[in-house]
């Protein structure tokens, strides 16, 4: 599906396929998918467990290689990059947010956010400055020195979002980012996503929850490795954010 009303897409995939196994055991987790995503767009890809949405996200983010097809980010063909090139791509161009947070337990919130900036080549001083700026942006400047074990689920996910932004990525990919959160924490995180999208950052979120998908600009339904439906959403993100968390409108 190739809907794009904002000029050249920042993400483009053509004929994207991911296969596992062989012969009678061959499974196509992603089956000849085409996708365009515009700059500043919030796209939700939804579907049941096992439909291929997380596999697709991993392909778009360079965490896995496709069996066939092409992936482009701002005119650069990602699927042809070397392993070293893919590592650089993941480090500088993409921010990842996962359901399980994946924070380092022995590091403070600030140190978790600093780490990708340091790995990306920033000086310790610049990494600290960037981490403080991002923790303030996600409303956790007063929790900078806390270990993840001392933070709530919503706070840990906000740290993870700050970490994803440490190297100013072109796009953020989120895999069930609110799956482990209660309603209040879900609303908290989705409001943050909405603010970042409004500021021009591009998001792709995969989810099985229609309420979460309804907070995006566009929603694609996926089943058995293929796109089966697409909808442009115009209902207003603030109302959708409140409704998705069950907190009223």
Which residues fall in each region the model found?
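ABC family nucleotide-binding domain
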Residues: 9-227
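ABC-family P-loop ATPase nucleotide-binding domain
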Residues: 1-19, 232-249
